C-alpha cells in the first residue's frame, strides 16, 4: 500500500510515544504536514517519566524528508489547545485534514486488580479528564477548521472495539467513552462532510511494553517466554498505517461512526506491519477465549 498525502495537514494529539508517535511518523512519511503535540519536551518530561519527547517524534519524520512541527501542548488546558489551532489556522491557511486524538496519560492513574470502590477516586476522575475530556477539548477547537472546508477526518484512538469489560471500571469508562465520542462526532459532522471514527490497535509493542518485557523491537519474540500472547502482538506502526489508509480513502465517510481495528483495516486496505506480517489480534483473542 502506498498513500500520497502530500498537501494535507494533520494534528496528532499525544504524539510523544506509542501509537501517537507512529501515526505522526506514518502521516509525515506519506507527505502530510504534521503537528506533533504532547506534554513531554526535551528537558521537561511529563508525569509519565518516560524518555520520549515530541521533538524526537518530529525528528523521525524530518529525517525521512517529511515536515513536522513539534508543539508542546497539554490538551486538558483549553487555552493551550486554542493556541495550537490558532497557530495551525495561521500557518496552514485554515487547512486541517486529519485530527488524531491519542492523548492518554492514564497509565500512572490505573490501579489493576481492585474493585472500583477501592480504586483511588481522584486517580479515576483524573483519568477521565486526561483521556476523555482532552479529546473533547481538542475536537472542540480543531473540528471547526474542517467544517469550514467541508472535509476532514477525526480519529479517536482507543483500546478495544467492543462493549466487553476492560478490566477496571475507570479504564473501561475512558476507553468506551472515546468510542462514543467518535459515534457522536460522526452524527453531528456528517452534514458537514467530516468523518469521525474510533480505532484500536491489538496487543501493541509500545516503548513501555517493550521495556516491561525487557526486550527491544529487534528481539521482541524473546518476550513470548514470559507471555505467550505476546506472539500475536503488533508494532505501533501497524495501527498507524491504518490511519494513513483511512486518511487517503476518498470514501472514508462510509466508515464514519464506526469502531475500527488495525487487523480488519489491514485486510481491507492491504497494508502490513513493518515486518511484512498482518497480525490479527481479534481472531487470536477470540480463539483463546473459546478454548
PLM regions with names:
Residues 22, 26, 141, 188:
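Rossmann-fold NAD(P)-dependent oxidoreductase module
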Residues 49-50, 114, 191, 203-230, ...:
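A glycine/serine/threonine-rich, flexible loop-to-helix segment
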Amino acid at each position: 500500500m502506498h498513500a500520497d498525502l502530500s498537501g494535507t495537514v494533520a494534528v496528532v494529539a499525544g504524539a510523544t510515544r506509542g501509537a501517537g508517535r507512529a501515526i505522526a511518523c506514518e502521516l509525515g512519511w506519506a507527505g502530510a504536514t504534521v503537528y506533533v503535540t504532547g506534554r513531554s519536551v526535551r528537558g521537561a518530561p511529563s508525569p509519565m517519566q518516560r524518555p520520549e519527547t515530541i521533538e524526537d517524534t518530529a525528528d523521525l519524520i524530518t529525517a525521512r524528508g517529511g515536515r513536522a512541527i513539534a508543539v508542546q501542548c497539554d490538551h486538558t488546558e483549553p487555552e493551550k489547545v486554542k493556541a495550537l489551532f490558532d497557530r495551525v489556522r495561521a500557518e496552514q491557511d485554515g487547512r486541517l485534514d486529519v485530527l488524531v486524538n491519542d492523548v492518554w496519560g492514564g497509565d500512572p492513574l490505573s490501579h489493576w486488580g481492585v474493585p472500583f470502590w477501592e480504586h483511588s477516586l481522584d486517580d479515576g476522575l483524573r483519568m477521565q479528564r486526561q483521556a476523555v475530556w482532552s479529546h473533547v477539548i481538542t475536537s472542540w477547537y480543531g473540528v471547526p477548521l474542517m467544517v469550514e472546508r467541508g472535509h476532514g477526518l477525526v480519529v479517536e484512538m482507543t483500546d478495544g472495539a467492543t462493549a466487553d469489560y476492560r478490566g477496571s471500571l475507570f479504564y473501561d469508562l475512558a476507553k468506551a467513552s472515546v468510542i462514543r465520542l467518535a459515534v457522536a462526532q460522526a452524527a453531528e459532522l456528517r452534514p458537514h462532510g467530516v468523518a469521525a471514527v474510533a480505532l484500536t490497535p491489538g496487543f501493541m509493542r509500545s516503548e513501555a511494553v517493550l521495556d516491561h518485557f525487557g526486550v527491544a523491537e529487534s528481539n521482541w519474540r524473546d518476550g513470548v517466554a514470559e507471555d505467550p500472547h505476546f506472539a500475536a502482538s503488533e508494532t505501533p506502526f501497524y495501527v498507524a498505517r491504518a490511519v494513513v489508509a483511512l486518511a487517503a480513502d476518498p470514501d472514508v465517510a462510509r466508515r464514519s461512526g464506526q469502531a475500527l481495528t488495525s487487523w480488519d483495516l489491514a485486510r481491507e486496505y492491504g497494508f502490513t506491519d513493518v515486518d511484512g506480517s498482518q497480525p490479527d489480534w481479534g481472531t487470536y483473542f477470540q480463539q483463546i477465549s473459546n478454548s
